[in-house]
Amino acid sequence: MDIVDMIVHVNETVPAERMNELEEVLRTDACVISACSSNPHLLMVTYNPACTTSGNLLNMVQAQGLHANLVGL
């Protein structure tokens, strides 16, 4: 299985509790292996590209009412 890491930059400053909620939202996707943050603006997501895309995962974050972009690695 291939895996891909991506970073999502959230424009808003998000409190730690809200970032934890975002991590949980991303983990609902069966293709997400892990989602974590150690910064109020950044989420690191590891996923299987065979069954989802970075765009789909970005849309999941944006659907939570946040302005977010992908950061290239």
Question: At which residue positions do the language-model features occur?
Answer:
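Short glycine-/aliphatic-rich beta-strand segments at the starts of folded cytosolic domains
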Residues: 1-12
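A generic structural motif
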Residues: 41-46
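Short acidic amphipathic segments
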Residues: 14, 22-38
